[in-house]
């Protein structure tokens, strides 16, 4: 008989009698911070980062999410930690430029890096679309000590159809991987289509 939920983060505990200890396999993440969003957006606009750099960084940060067990994703900013910061699909060379700038903005604005990464993606979309993109803060920053490098290695993408990326040693059809990942991200077919076409219209592609 199932007496508890053992999938996902600690926030999914239910009831008053939950354990207090923090377990690394639950991918612990500290609470987020309150900050002035408009001030942070102003700093992002002055950062000199390109729209493409901000969008790709925000996307890669979120792309590791798995709806099956709620691992990965933008919350925690683990794209700045090992192993994700070294994944080929995350463009380590680009991250080496982008992350220090976003970390400085996070420190100056009192925000988490996780929130600033997402907010920068929003700012870039607003720049190219002229539309306002809703933003909800509250993400926290995990530490390297809170990250199980070995287990996170299994989240490394072998392909990202949204960015037209596929490892050379992968024989699976990329369109099949695209559909599988879209399902893990919880995307509908229209949402998947809009994302792929939106990235292409902005010239965002690994090729």
Give residue ranges: language-model regions.
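Long, well-ordered alpha/beta core segments of mature domains
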Residues: 1-207
């Amino acid at each position: 008989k199932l007496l508890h939920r053992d999938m996902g983060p600690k926030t999914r505990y239910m009831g008053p009698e939950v354990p207090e200890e923090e377990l690394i396999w639950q991918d612990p993440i500290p609470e987020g911070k309150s900050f002035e969003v408009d001030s942070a957006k102003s700093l992002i606009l002055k950062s000199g980062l390109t729209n493409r750099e901000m969008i790709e960084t925000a996307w890669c940060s979120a792309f590791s999410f798995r709806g099956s067990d709620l691992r990965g994703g933008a919350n925690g900013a683990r794209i700045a930690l090992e192993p994700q910061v070294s994944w080929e699909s995350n463009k380590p060379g680009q991250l080496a430029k982008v992350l220090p700038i976003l970390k400085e903005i996070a420190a100056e604005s009192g925000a988490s890096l996780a929130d600033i990464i997402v907010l920068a993606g929003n700012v870039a979309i607003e720049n190219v679309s002229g539309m306002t993109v809703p933003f909800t803060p509250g993400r926290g920053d995990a530490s390297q000590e809170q990250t199980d490098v070995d287990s996170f290695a299994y989240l490394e993408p072998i392909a990202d159809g949204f960015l037209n990326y596929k490892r050379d040693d992968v024989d699976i059809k990329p369109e099949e991987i695209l559909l599988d990942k879209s399902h893990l991200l919880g995307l509908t077919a229209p949402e998947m289509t809009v994302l792929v076409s939106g990235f292409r219209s902005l010239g965002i592609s690994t090729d």
